[in-house]
C-alpha cells in the first residue's frame, strides 16, 4: 500500500456483502472514473481498492480517503457522493464534512479490541500481496521451523478455545487428533454459520481470507494432515469467490501444495459448498455432508478426532478459531493468554443485531460486560425504549434479562446463566419484544432445521412449538407451562445431537427469567409487549393525541378516524393489530393493552 507516500491518494471502499448490497461496486466505479480524469492533468497517483467489512454495517457504504497518510472516513457513500468527494476533498483539499462519520462511529470502535478483524477493512482481500505486506504467512514460515508438538503446546498454553459453539480447548483437540491412530488425518473448517442474523465467519472470509487459510495450514502441520476442507454455504457467493481466489493465490506462491516453504510438509485445501442446512453446523453432520451423504448427525460414542471424515481422525474448527492461530504463533502464548479472563482467553466477535442503534460486527475481549457491548459500543436501544433481554448463542441459545447486563461475557458465565456463547450471535430485545413469541420463533427455526432422525427432537420440539403457538393465540393454560418444562427436559436428556439437546434453551431461559410474561398470556389473556395479535388491543390516549393524522394515514385497514388537530380513535372491529399506528406515532399516544 502507498498510504505513506507524500504524493499518494488511497481510497478504500467497503465491499463486504453489506457494502456491495448498498452500492459498493458503483461507488468504486465512480471514484475510478473521476480519478481517471484527474490523472490526465495531474501526477498524484490515486488508487482505489476494495476492502472487507469494517463492522459498522449500518453505515455502509463506508469509504476511507487517505491523502498523504491523513485519513478521513465517509459514511453512506453513493456514486454521486463519490464524485463530490473527489471534487471537494481530493482536488479542493476540503473534506465534505456533512458526510464524514459521526461520534457514534468512533464510539462503536473505541471499546473494541480488534485482533482477528484487525486488517478487515484495511487490506484488499483479493490481493495476497497486501496480506504479505502486513506479515502474512510469516507465522506459517515460523511454524515450519518448529516441532509439531511445540506448536500444539503453544496453542494449549494460549488457552484458545473453539469459537463455533461449546468452547472446547483447541490445543487439546489438535493433540487428540495428532495422537489418534489412522491416516490420513483431515483438517476441516466450518464456514457454514447458520444462525439467523450471524455473519462473523462470512465477514472474515470476505475481508481477510488468507488469515484463516494460514491458520488452517499451521494446524495441519501440527496435526500431521495432508488434506483439508472448508465447508462453506453456497448462499455466501462473495465469500466463496474470494476464498477460491485466495486458495489459487496461495498455491501459486507455494503456501499450499507440495513441499511448502521448501519443507517436506505438503498440504492442500478443497472447498465443499453447503446447502444451508443449520444441522450441518453439527460436526458429524458436516462431515457426512462432505462425504456426499445427507447431513445427519451421528452418535458420538467415538470422537471425530478418532473417527471423523471417512472414518479417519479429523479436526474441525470454525473460521474465527483458525483465524486466531497465526497471531498466537507470531506473538506467543503468554501475549494471547493475557487477553480475556482466566478461563476464556482472547477476543470474541459478535454479530450485534436486533433492537440496537449500532448494528454490526464487534470484536471485544472476553470478560467485557453485556452493558458495555450493548450501550457503549451498540449505542443503546432506539427511541429510548427500555432494554428487556439479549439472546446469545443463536437459535439454541438463551435470553438473558437486564439483571445480567453487568455480568462478564465468557463461556462459563453465559452457560451458568442458561445461555451459551455459540458462534457469536447477539440479538437485543426491547420492551416491545414478546418473550413467548421470541421463544416460539427460535424453536420453530430449530424444528424446521432438524434432521428428523431422533424422536425426542423431531416430535418433542414440534409439540413445544404447537404449545407455544396456542399460548400466543390466547388458547394456553398454566398446565401448558408445566408441560413445556417437562418436554424441554426430556429433549435435552435424550436427543441424539447438540442441536436437539440445546433446542429448548430459549424456552427454558425465558421461563426462568420471564415467567410472568407467560402467565400474562395464559391467565390474563394479554400480551404485555403487544405482539401477539389475539391478546392485544391498541387504543389512542386522548391526552397525548395531537390530531396529526399520521396514524390514520398509515393504517392499512382504515381503522382510525378523526379530524385534523383533533383526537383520533381506533375502530376495534376493523383493527388488524398490525402495530403500524403504534410504531408510527411520534407522541406515544397509541397505547397497547
Model-based region annotation:
Residues 215-217, 367-382:
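Short amphipathic, charge-patterned alpha-helical segments
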Residues 18-20, 136, 155-177, 276-288, ...:
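Conserved phosphate/anionic-ligand binding catalytic regions in large, soluble enzymes, centered on
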Residues 344-358, 370, 528-576, 580:
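C-terminal accessory/binding modules appended to enzymatic or scaffolding proteins
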Residues 98-157, 311, 317-332:
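Flexible inter-domain linker/hinge segments
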Residues 123-125, 131-138, 187-201, 304-309, ...:
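Gly-rich Lys/Arg/Thr-decorated short loops/hinges at beta-loop-alpha junctions or inter-strand turns
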Residues 59-65, 456-462, 540, 550-569, ...:
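Iron-sulfur cluster-binding cysteine motifs and their immediate structural context
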Amino acid at each position: 500500500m502507498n498510504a505513506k507516500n507524500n504524493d499518494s491518494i488511497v481510497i478504500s471502499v467497503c465491499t463486504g456483502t453489506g457494502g456491495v448490497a448498498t452500492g459498493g461496486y458503483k461507488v468504486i466505479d465512480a471514484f475510478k472514473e473521476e480519478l481517471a480524469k484527474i490523472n490526465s492533468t495531474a501526477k498524484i497517483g490515486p488508487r482505489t481498492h476494495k476492502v472487507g467489512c469494517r463492522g459498522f454495517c449500518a453505515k455502509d457504504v463506508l469509504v476511507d480517503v487517505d491523502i498523504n497518510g491523513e485519513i478521513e472516513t465517509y459514511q453512506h457513500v453513493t456514486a454521486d457522493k463519490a464524485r463530490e468527494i473527489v471534487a471537494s476533498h481530493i482536488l479542493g483539499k476540503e473534506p465534505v464534512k456533512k458526510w464524514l462519520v459521526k461520534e457514534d462511529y468512533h464510539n462503536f470502535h473505541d471499546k473494541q479490541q480488534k485482533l482477528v478483524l484487525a486488517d478487515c477493512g484495511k487490506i484488499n482481500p483479493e490481493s495476497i500481496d497486501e496480506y504479505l505486506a502486513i506479515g502474512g504467512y510469516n507465522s506459517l514460515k515460523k511454524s515450519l521451523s518448529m516441532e509439531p508438538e511445540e506448536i500444539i503446546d503453544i496453542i494449549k498454553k494460549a488457552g484458545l478455545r473453539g469459537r463455533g459453539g461449546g468452547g472446547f480447548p483447541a490445543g487439546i483437540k489438535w493433540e487428540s487428533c495428532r495422537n489418534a491412530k489412522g491416516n490420513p488425518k483431515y483438517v476441516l473448517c466450518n464456514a457454514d454459520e447458520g444462525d439467523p442474523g450471524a455473519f462473523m465467519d462470512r465477514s472474515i472470509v470476505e475481508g481477510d481470507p488468507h488469515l484463516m487459510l494460514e491458520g488452517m495450514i499451521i494446524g495441519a502441520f501440527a496435526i500431521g494432515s495432508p488434506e483439508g476442507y472448508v465447508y462453506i454455504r453456497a448462499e455466501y457467493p462473495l465469500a466463496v469467490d474470494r476464498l477460491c481466489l485466495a486458495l489459487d493465490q496461495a498455491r501459486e506462491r507455494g503456501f499450499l501444495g507440495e513441499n511448502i516453504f521448501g519443507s517436506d510438509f505438503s498440504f492442500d485445501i478443497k472447498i465443499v459448498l453447503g446447502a444451508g442446512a443449520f444441522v450441518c453446523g453439527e460436526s458429524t453432520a458436516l462431515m457426512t455432508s462432505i462425504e456426499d451423504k445427507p447431513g445427519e448427525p451421528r452418535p458420538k460414542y467415538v470422537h471425530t478426532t478418532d473417527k471423523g471424515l471417512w472414518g479417519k481422525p479429523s479436526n474441525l474448527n470454525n473460521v474465527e478459531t483458525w483465524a486466531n492461530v497465526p497471531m498466537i504463533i507470531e506473538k506467543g502464548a503468554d501475549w494471547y493468554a493475557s487477553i480475556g479472563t482466566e478461563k476464556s482467553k482472547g477476543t470474541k466477535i459478535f454479530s450485534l443485531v436486533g433492537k440496537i442503534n449500532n448494528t454490526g460486527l464487534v470484536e471485544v475481549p472476553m470478560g467485557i460486560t453485556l452493558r458495555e457491548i450493548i450501550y457503549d459500543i451498540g449505542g443503546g436501544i432506539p427511541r429510548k425504549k427500555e432494554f428487556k433481554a439479549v439472546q446469545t448463542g443463536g437459535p439454541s441459545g438463551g435470553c438473558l434479562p437486564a439483571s445480567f447486563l453487568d455480568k462478564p461475557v465468557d463461556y462459563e458465565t453465559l452457560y451458568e446463566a442458561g445461555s451459551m456463547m455459540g458462534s457469536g450471535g447477539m440479538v437485543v430485545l426491547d420492551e416491545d419484544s414478546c418473550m413467548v413469541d421470541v421463544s416460539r420463533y427460535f424453536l420453530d427455526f430449530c424444528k424446521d432445521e432438524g434432521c428428523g432422525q431422533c424422536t425426542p427432537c423431531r416430535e418433542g420440539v414440534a409439540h413445544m412449538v404447537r404449545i407455544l403457538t396456542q399460548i400466543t393465540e390466547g388458547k394456553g393454560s398454566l398446565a401448558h407451562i408445566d408441560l413445556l418444562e417437562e418436554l424441554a427436559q426430556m429433549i435435552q436428556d435424550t436427543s441424539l445431537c447438540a442441536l436437539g439437546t440445546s433446542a429448548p434453551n430459549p424456552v427454558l431461559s425465558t421461563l426462568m427469567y420471564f415467567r410472568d410474561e407467560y402467565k400474562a398470556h395464559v391467565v390474563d389473556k394479554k400480551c404485555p409487549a403487544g405482539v401477539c395479535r389475539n391478546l392485544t388491543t391498541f387504543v389512542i390516549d386522548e391526552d397525548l393525541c395531537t390530531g396529526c393524522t399520521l396514524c390514520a394515514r398509515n393504517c392499512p385497514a382504515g381503522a382510525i378516524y378523526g379530524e385534523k388537530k383533533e383526537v383520533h380513535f381506533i375502530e376495534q372491529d376493523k383493527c388488524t393489530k398490525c402495530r403500524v399506528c403504534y410504531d408510527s406515532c411520534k407522541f406515544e399516544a397509541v397505547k397497547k393493552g
